Amino acid sequence: LYLAFEILDYALLSAPGAPLKKALIDAGIGKDVSGSFDSGIYQPVFSIVAKNANVEQKEAFISTIEDTLRKIAEEGIDKKALRAGINYHEFRFREADFGSYPRGLMYGLQLFDSWLYDEEKPFIHMKAIPTFEFLKEQVETGYFEELIREYILDNPHGSIVIIRPEQGMT
């Protein structure tokens, strides 16, 4: 799931023409829409963020996300976007370019993503090539659509967080 949700985040919210981002912006919800997947914790979190949205749009935000994801789960996600997401993340993995951060430090932090919660598999994220191959094989099978259904649409655990700025408190 670690990489699969990174791919879903890319295809749904980051890629050019990403359908979930487009649906929220077309509905006038927020000026900037983004997503993230935090997998370095025991219970991973998939977030959808609409910046500069009105509090009154909360229900529209929820229904737009649910309706769009149901449609995508039923009709299928754009296969080109999935392949692009896989290629993007595989390229980043193979290049191992961490900018100004020391490579060893970044590898150590990657190890913690699994090692903290499964002492038997500290290197699982370092050996990702088979996972990329698996994900490529799953593009045409409905695997990603099932992830949307199981882990987002049919998941009873979720939250809506509204952060309101207070004028003059910058």
Where are the predicted features?
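Amphipathic heptad-repeat coiled-coil/leucine-zipper-like oligomerization helices
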Residues: Y151-N155
